[in-house]
From Swiss-Prot:
Entry protein name: Deoxyguanosinetriphosphate triphosphohydrolase-like protein
NCBIfam families: dGTP_triPase, PRK01286.1-1
Family, similarity comment: Belongs to the dGTPase family. Type 2 subfamily.
Alphabetized CDD domains for the sequence: HDc
Ranges of biased composition (kind: Basic and acidic residues): 28-39
Any one Gene Ontology molecular-function term assigned to this protein's record: dGTPase activity
Keywords assigned by UniProt, alphabetized: Hydrolase
All copies of domain HD, residue ranges: 73-208
Stretch list, region Disordered: 12-39
Matches recorded under Pfam families: HD (PF01966), HD_assoc (PF13286)
GO biological process annotation, one example: dGTP catabolic process
Entry superkingdom: Bacteria
Amino acid sequence: MNKDGTVVLMNELASYASDPSKTRGRRHSEPPPENRTEFQRDRDRIIHSNAFRRLEYKTQVFVNHEGDLFRTRLTHSLEVAQIARTLARSLRVSEDLTEAIALAHDLGHTPFGHAGQDELNACMRELAPQAGGFEHNLQSLRVVDELEERYAEFNGLNLCFETREGILKHCSATHARQLGAVGERFLDRTQPSLEAQLANLADEVAYNNHDVDDGLRSGLITLEQLQEVGIFARHYAEVARRYPQLAPRRATSETIRRMINTLIVDLTATSLARIRDHAPASADDVRRAPPLAGFSAAVRREADELKKFLFDNLYRHYRVVRMTTKVQRIVRELFQAFLGDPRLLPPDYRREQPQDQARAISDYIAGMTDRYAIREHRRLFEMG
């Protein structure tokens, strides 16, 4: 916002922003784009990828076929990208890079959400320990580096270093050493770009608040229970006072809208204050500083309270636990079947070496949608 109160419509990059003209490059050399920046090209490649389209049929919390209005990984990624762009514009960093990271952050997610990821990781560690485990964050990087097959001259999407690094929210030292330059910050304990920090926090804002919406729609949590959560109770009371005749469904939507706005406004103000305190003059200064993007202490407590409420009351609800048990069995039985007899796999996923075969199986399962995994399981284990 300008001094006269008008909203900034064009984002003039700050000195501490990631500059697309100064990118650290791509894994494979390419001519520069003619009518886009390097980060815009990354964003566009992500949107046009097969992995991005498959997110439409992958779970956020509820299995994909359970309801048309529940969020999927695709709708979640779009919501994260919208919040991330808003934050990037306010802090005068690259909207395109922030958006690209936000859109790509879940490309490596398995079917069935975190339940599928946890079970696939357990299978890899128990049944193929020589191959290493499975982590969706690393898988997202693997998707954009190796697994996408769209271009004649290289595997993957050949994204910029800054986008690839931003996709990695966390990484063990062992994996970081294997990844080379993109994993260096996990070894020298420096920070990612401000764009990556904002995309990460936008993810948190989106899933916490939108899981409240989906939880209420499903009937697994209630308005009465949410009165125990400070940030929800405060905004819901404000909405009830101002709009006493409003139907509960619309009052809830208005409450969630206000909660998201509270988090974005606080995150923006707190991050700008940290930037003023540390005065980074370049993107490299951002890396050497403490985390510059974040919530105030008070709002962080409220966000953590909401997160704990969702964990205790939604993610551990008995109906969710029942579905978790079912989908974990599907993932495990698929993995065991393919590992026991690789001839069951499509030819492109068969490998000579055992550790390579296990990784190819995890790639195959991780790339499945919820519906495809269920159908594949039926084809293998049901008669008819």
